[in-house]
């Protein structure tokens, strides 16, 4: 009996430990999201149409793989991390009977996008300030889910949530598009990113926009220096 009681205690301790670890991980992600949200408020990301995510491209690829995608005319479309909607506003214009929903952490970018949508008189697209982690089955199902420029920049818990959304919020014949960065193509851009991160280490007290401009100038200096080296080597 004592041994059994001890085993139960150990199991209970293990479960408690897992719960604590899960809570800590969740708190860490929430803190990260707060930092991300502030950065998105401070610096507006360029949002424009991305050809690979156009509905006709997604439907064509689905057909090539033997799938039976939903008709584009009345499709329900969700974009995660939509910024101010530059990628789906143009599609909402082209498919007036389809419905488009975009979500993003940034309230300022969502506000900007909705103002643009209202000025264009569009009624088939809505942008919502929302955390990806807060989406569940009650959010509805969609025929096309677009996740571009997010996967490679978020922690694992958000990646897991994206996959969950593509599982639970995708219609029976739905298509999900998830882009991600890979080597060797992204190695050079990663090097630029590392130069910028190194350059900003001593300037962390500066506002984000000022740090961004500062590090971009560092990149320009590096580029100019490399150009000088090339000219010297040619002589």
Residue ranges and their predicted role:
Residues 42, 50-75, 90:
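Conserved alpha-helix/loop element of class I SAM-dependent methyltransferases that forms part
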Residues 106-108:
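Conserved SAM/SAH-binding beta-strand->alpha-helix loop
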Residues 121-132:
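Conserved SAM-binding strand-loop segment of SAM-dependent methyltransferases
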Residues 160-172:
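A short glycine-rich, Lys/Arg-flanked "PGG" loop and its adjoining helix->strand segment in the class I
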Residues 99-104:
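Conserved SAM-binding motif I beta-strand of class I
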Residues 84-97:
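Conserved SAM-binding loop of SAM-dependent methyltransferases across substrates and taxa
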């Amino acid at each position: 009996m004592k041994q059994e009681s001890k085993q139960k205690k150990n199991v209970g301790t293990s479960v408690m430990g897992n719960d604590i670890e899960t809570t800590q991980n969740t708190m860490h992600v929430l803190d990260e999201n707060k930092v991300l949200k502030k950065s998105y408020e401070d610096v507006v990301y360029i949002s424009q149409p991305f050809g690979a995510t156009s509905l006709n491209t997604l439907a064509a690829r689905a057909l090539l793989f033997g799938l039976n995608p939903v008709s584009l005319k009345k499709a329900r479309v969700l974009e995660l991390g939509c910024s101010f909607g530059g990628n789906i506003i143009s599609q909402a214009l082209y498919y007036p009977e389809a419905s488009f929903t975009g979500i993003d952490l940034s309230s300022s970018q969502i506000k900007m996008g909705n103002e643009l949508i209202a000025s264009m008189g569009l009624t088939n697209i809505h942008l919502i300030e929302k955390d990806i982690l807060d989406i569940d089955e009650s959010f509805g199902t969609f025929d096309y889910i677009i996740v571009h420029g997010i996967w490679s920049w978020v922690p694992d818990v958000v990646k897991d949530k994206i996959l969950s959304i593509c599982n639970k919020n995708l219609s029976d014949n739905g298509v999900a598009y998830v882009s991600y960065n890979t080597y060797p193509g992204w190695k050079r851009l990663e090097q630029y990113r590392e130069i910028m991160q190194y350059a900003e280490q001593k300037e962390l007290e500066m506002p984000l926009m000022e740090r961004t401009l500062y590090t971009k100038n560092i990149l320009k200096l590096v580029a100019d220096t490399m150009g000088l080296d090339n000219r010297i080597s040619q002589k």
